[in-house]
UniProtKB/Swiss-Prot annotation:
Taxonomic classification: Bacteria, Pseudomonadati, Pseudomonadota, Betaproteobacteria, Burkholderiales
Primary role: Catalyzes the isomerization between 2-isopropylmalate and 3-isopropylmalate, via the formation of 2-isopropylmaleate.
Cross-referenced CDD domains: IPMI
Protein name listed in UniProt: 3-isopropylmalate dehydratase large subunit
This protein's pathway: Amino-acid biosynthesis; L-leucine biosynthesis; L-leucine from 3-methyl-2-oxobutanoate: step 2/4
GO biological process: L-leucine biosynthetic process
Entry's EC annotation: 4.2.1.33
Chain residues that bind [4Fe-4S] cluster: 347, 410, 413
Keywords from the UniProt entry: 4Fe-4S, Amino-acid biosynthesis, Branched-chain amino acid biosynthesis, Iron, Iron-sulfur, Leucine biosynthesis, Lyase, Metal-binding
Gene symbol of the encoding locus: leuC
InterPro entries cross-referenced by the UniProt entry: 3-IsopropMal_deHydase_lsu (IPR004430), Acnase/IPM_dHydase_lsu_aba_1/3 (IPR015931), Acoase/IPM_deHydtase_lsu_aba (IPR001030), Aconitase_4Fe-4S_BS (IPR018136), Aconitase_4Fe-4S_dom (IPR036008), IPM_dehydratase_rel_enz (IPR050067), IPMI_cat (IPR033941)
Molecular function in Gene Ontology: 3-isopropylmalate dehydratase activity; 4 iron, 4 sulfur cluster binding; metal ion binding
Domain of life: Bacteria
Reactions the enzyme catalyzes: (2R,3S)-3-isopropylmalate = (2S)-2-isopropylmalate
PROSITE patterns the UniProt entry points to: ACONITASE_1 (PS00450), ACONITASE_2 (PS01244)
């Protein structure tokens, strides 16, 4: 019987199935950070349970760490407590951790892949919804809650019910100036933030195959914004070349054995999907969100939508509320919207290719950050990304243009550290969520690609980067 990639991964990790379909899955890799792990470790201590498989775990502090000078530590007492608690718990239980001043430290969904801790065919979980990122490797990856974090630490298994299969095919060649971020925003704009609810999405088609691993990670990262719990891309030579030689990757005979298995990690011909969505890459344009949900997105050449043209009353009300919060008027050209701050970073877009794309735009425009932009910041996803960017001189490009070059961390993606928006400030952001208050109380977030964010910083407003040549 022909199987989808999701079917294969699920079946390969099934330990036991109850009569109602509840399945006990084996978990290969567990990633931890400081926000969702303290209560889980406390539960282990109270029950006097050990960590079942210490080597399956990898931890890092990312949400609360400062992205400015770290020599003076963490100023906020709550943030400091969370980071210190993770340090103490990992030391106590013997779990490998990249602490704040380790040059390998970074965002958990960046360091996992770059260390080779994320491998094809794995089940990967983390107490973070954007664990879907790791599905780019043909791994079944999704976020879990704190009680489940404790369960995985104690048993290396997890209970769940199988989702339905969705295939999203993007065929054709992506136009110049468009990126993986534009692909996934266009997908979400098409199916909505509830379109993937109850599904695991496999992303396929020639436009997906043409993406680098970093691009595929961007797409899978935002599967959760489409309502899905997980996103997947089949394994191919691009996957294998990325993984080979990384610290956690198998070597020698074990590598050959792994590749033999990994090469089977694709949907079989004739495999049945519960739903199929198709897009043409040629139709995708640089995307910008205008509202307070990732599905509220248009191309840069469009105007802010008019709620009066929406027939569905529920959607119309949501649009009206979003426009009020964002302080935007219908029919305003997207290119005329000014920005106050620019954030290039997050687990969606903080890898070396993102840094290069943004730096290229800065060099191409050849000017400094616009006078109306209060802050433009670039936050690498890890210490290794930062080091690579500095070897290439990208930091000098940014700093010369007036951008701030920061230390790695989640930063302004969420208002959980010192990097945040003030009420009423408008931000061009390469992150993944534009909910009310996501980047700070009263802050207004527009999701874009790194190139689009860099251009907005220089021009002071959104621009169509296809015009740059």
């Amino acid at each position: 019987m022909a199987k989808t990639l999701y079917d294969k991964l699920w079946d390969d990790h099934t330990v036991h199935v109850e009569e109602d379909g509840t399945t006990l899955l084996y978990i290969d890799r567990h990633l931890l950070h400081e926000v969702t792990s303290p209560q889980a470790f406390e539960g282990l201590k109270i029950a006097e349970r050990p960590v079942w498989r210490i080597s399956a775990n990898l931890a890092v502090s990312d949400h609360n760490v400062p992205t400015t000078d770290r020599s003076e530590g963490i100023a906020d007492p709550v943030s400091k407590l969370q980071v210190d608690t993770l340090d103490a718990n990992c030391d106590s239980f013997g779990i490998t951790q990249f602490k704040m001043n380790d040059h390998r430290q970074g965002i958990v969904h960046v360091i996992g892949p770059e260390q080779g801790a994320t491998l094809p065919g794995m089940t990967v979980v983390c107490g973070d919804s954007h664990t879907s990122t790791h599905g780019a490797f043909g791994a079944l990856a999704h976020g879990i809650g704190t009680s489940e974090v404790e369960h995985v630490l104690a048993t290396q298994t997890l209970l769940g019910k199988k989702a339905k299969n969705m295939l999203v095919k993007v065929e054709g060649k992506l136009p110049r100036g468009c990126t993986a971020k534009d692909i996934v925003l266009a997908i979400i704009g098409k199916i909505g933030t509830a379109g993937g609810t109850g599904y695991t999405i496999e992303f396929a088609g020639s436009a997906i195959r043409d993406l680098t691993m970093e691009g595929r990670m961007t797409v899978c990262n935002m599967a959760i914004e489409a309502g899905a719990r997980a996103g997947l891309v089949a394994v191919d030579n691009v996957t294998l070349e990325y993984v080979k030689g990384r610290p956690y990757a198998p070597q020698g005979v074990e590598w050959d054995q792994a590749v033999a298995y990994w090469s089977t990690l694709h949907s079989d011909a004739g495999a049945s999907f519960d739903q199929v969505i198709e897009l043409r890459a040629e139709d995708i344009r640089p995307q910008v969100t205008w509202g307070t949900s990732p599905e509220m997105v248009v191309s840069i050449e469009d105007r802010v939508p008019d709620p009066e043209k929406e027939k569905d009353p529920t959607r119309r009300n949501a649009m009206e509320r979003a426009l009020e919060y964002m302080n935007l008027q219908p029919n305003v050209p997207m290119e005329s919207i000014n920005v106050d701050k620019v954030f290039i970073g997050s687990c969606t877009n903080s890898r070396i290719e993102d840094m290069r794309a943004a730096a290229w735009v800065v060099q191409k425009l050849g000017r400094k950050v616009a006078s109306n932009v209060k802050l433009a910041m670039v936050v690498p996803g890890s210490g290794l990304v930062k080091e690579q960017a500095e070897r290439e001189g990208l930091d000098k490009v940014f700093k010369a243009a007036g951008f701030e070059w920061r230390e790695p961390g989640c930063s302004m993606c969420l208002a959980m550290n010192a990097d945040r928006l003030e009420p009423g400030e408008r931000c061009a952001s390469t992150s993944n969520r534009n909910f009310e208050g996501r980047q700070g109380a009263g802050g207004r977030t527009h999701l874009v690609s790194p190139a689009m964010a860099a251009a907005a910083a220089i021009e002071g407003h959104f621009v169509d980067i296809r015009k740059l040549g």
